[in-house]
Amino acid sequence: MNIWLSMLTTTGLGAIIGGFTNHLAIKMLFRPHRPIYIGKFQVPFTPGLIPKRRDELAVQLGKMVVEHLLTPEGIGKKLTNEEFQKGLIHWAQVEVDKVITNEQSLRHMLEKWDVAHVEKEATEKIEQVITEKIQAFLEEYYTYTWEQALPHSVHEKIENAIPNVSAFILGRATQFFESEEGKARLSKMIDDFFASRGTLLNLVGMFLGNVSVVDRVQPEVIKFLGQDGTKQLLTEVLQKELEKLKGRDVKEVETFVEKEMIVSSILSAVKVEETVSKFLNQSVQQVCEPVRETIMEKVVPGVVTKGLKWGAENVASILNNLHLAEIVQQEVSTFSTERLEDLVLSITKNELKMITYLGALLGGMIGIVQGLLLLFLK
């Protein structure tokens, strides 16, 4: 009976000592958090291992993350993974679709995104671009003659149109002189002519008798305007003037219309401010609807694919510029010892318990061996 009690005692003591020793060793990894002094003498094993080596641990964790966890190869492989790309494209399409189907006005959306004075800035920018383009166009074309400035096809169209222009001018002139207004104007011209000639009017009156001069002149004017020869004459005059115009410089337009007036007239016709205002008052859905399918089926997948490809090709440079090791080191260095202890224990809690139990098991086995040795020695 005493023998079995001795074996039980040695086994129990061995288990207790083994378990407690391992438990104490685990605790000494973290405790105490600060060095303990007796006078000027620092108690050995204080502070605990992890508090004492926290800075070194932070450095090593940073290196481990960069060299073994977040490696360029690993991230690059993930970025080029087909399933990952499909998932990211789908997510991007969903998010983009939420934006482009929004019924709020474009102006309201921009204000939500803190884009201020967009209407004023857009108007000024567009007007500036238009002005610069017009001025550049005029600067270039002012160095040309009209023959150089206009395409050959335009010259042909103008030349072919001259007979029709002549017919149009003569037709309108005929209509005018056939009207009462035209007759009155012709009468005034005749009166002014004879008024400057004095007695010539009396001499003409003797020949014409009671018939007024305008009644005799009007039919002749109309007859003259309707003759083919008159049309041919006017056509030849217009053709000669066109040939003269071809050799003249475009810059001569400035003598009639200043460059600034041309620019101002075009800007007034375009109505940039009104156009921009109408555009911003449209809903995002109205603006994007014509191109929604293109955005969803082509633009979004294309942008995501190219972005991932660029990221995979430049991942090493990106990681270097991020300085991940320094970030991890700085974050770990800011952890309190208590937080660091909780972090490690939350990960290794079960394993550390098993180490304690293993110590108790080994201690118990040693106790059994001691009991057996005592038994044989007796």
From Swiss-Prot:
Keyword Transmembrane among record annotations: yes
Keywords of this entry: Cell membrane, Membrane, Transmembrane, Transmembrane helix
Pfam families attached to this UniProt entry: DUF445
UniProt-annotated location(s): Cell membrane
Coiled coil: none
Membrane topology, from the record: Multi-pass membrane protein
Superkingdom in the source lineage: Bacteria
Residues that span the membrane, as ranges: 1-21, 357-377
GO cellular component: plasma membrane
Family: Belongs to the UPF0754 family.
Protein name: UPF0754 membrane protein BCAH187_A1042
Origin species: Bacillus cereus (strain AH187)
